[in-house]
Amino acid sequence: TVHGGRDPEGVGPEGLWVDSILELKPTRPEGAEIVWEWHAWDHIASELGGIANGKPVPTDITNPKKFNINYIDLNHTSNFQNPDFYSDWMHTNAIDYNPKLDQIAIDSPNIGEFYIIDHSTANYDDPQAGIDAAAGPAGDILYRWGNPKAYGAGEKADQKLYFEHDIHWIEPG
């Protein structure tokens, strides 16, 4: 993890759990195959630099399309009494898919934000091509809201979300 630019002080005894999304196609009578995947690890920035998945980690932590791997919201003091909090960095606990936009919304209570990512990188004729596309710039954050301090664009007073849970797309109208 430290090689990915995470400050060693922010790594818990269980390592660092970086969130992922897997889309599975059932294979009958049992099992499934991965047809698309997205990993937050492919979309990080760190002021410390580093290497993640064989690629240099961008150092511009103010880029809103990237996750600052060293951002921790210290307002969750009760969580910091639990060493596992450092491991569960984002604590993504909700996901919703919008088929009209082909976009996915996820939330991160530990960072105090929600994110929109592009699912149109999926390629069901060639799943690996879609997985590769999601790992590149096409898989970066399209939109984020809730805590501009997490990417250096605001102060604590600008934060709008606090340890939110559950995200849903709102139907037009």
Predicted regions and their residues:
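Histidine-/acidic-rich catalytic cores in large beta-rich domains
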Residues: 1-173
